[in-house]
C-alpha cells in the first residue's frame, strides 16, 4: 500500500488554493490518517472511502477541504492500483456520494478500474496528473 504524507496533502492544498492556508495540524494529521486501516492494509476501496469521508469531515484547512479530499482521495486510489474513471460528469455530486459513508464504497467502486500500470510512481507526479486532468472539476468544486 502507498500512502500520502501530511506534507503531500499540504502540497496538494497549496496547488489548489494557490497560497498557503491556515490549518489545524492536529486535524490535518487525523484527516490524513483516515487512509490507514487497522491490522493488515489490503482493502483499497474501504480505505479510500474512509479517506474521502474522514478528510472532508475533519476539514483541517480554512478553505478547499472538499477539493483537497477529492484530489488526495483520487491520488490514493491511483497510487494503489485503482484508476479513477468516473462515469458521472458532475464530480461534485460524485464527491457527495463518496464522502457519505452509506454510499462511499459504491461510488468509488463504480468509478475505478484496476490499473494496468505496474511501475512505481511518485505521489507528487500522480497528484500533478490528477490536478491537470480534473482542472475544470476542481475549479467548480472551489465555487
Language-model segment annotations:
Residues 1-143:
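FIC/Doc superfamily catalytic core
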